[in-house]
Amino acid sequence: MKTAYLYKNQGTCSSHIKLVVEDGRLVTAEYYGGCNGNTKGIAALVQGMPIDEVITRLEGIRCGFKPTSCPDQMAKALTLIKNGESTPSLKIITEEEA
């Protein structure tokens, strides 16, 4: 079953990421804001990948002097999803919102 999430980024130029996950795989990802070409590129590269692999590849990437980045924020969101954690930064959204 596909589940859509909206994650509020912290410390990045992009404000949110919409993630659709099904059976442990990232179906789609869409960033709101940020560097348009880069965030679209990241989303295209990880589409269809197992979330564990996405986390491994993106976790800890920094943007300049910032302690995080748009890819790192995706890894943080997917870690929360994988662990079934609920935070104010992550919410399940309906298909209409997705």
PLM regions: where:
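Short, hydrophobic/aromatic-rich segments at coil-to-beta transitions
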Residues: 1-6
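Short acidic DE-rich linear segments
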Residues: 92-98
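Active-site- and interface-proximal helix/loop "cap" or "latch" segments in soluble metabolic
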Residues: 8-92
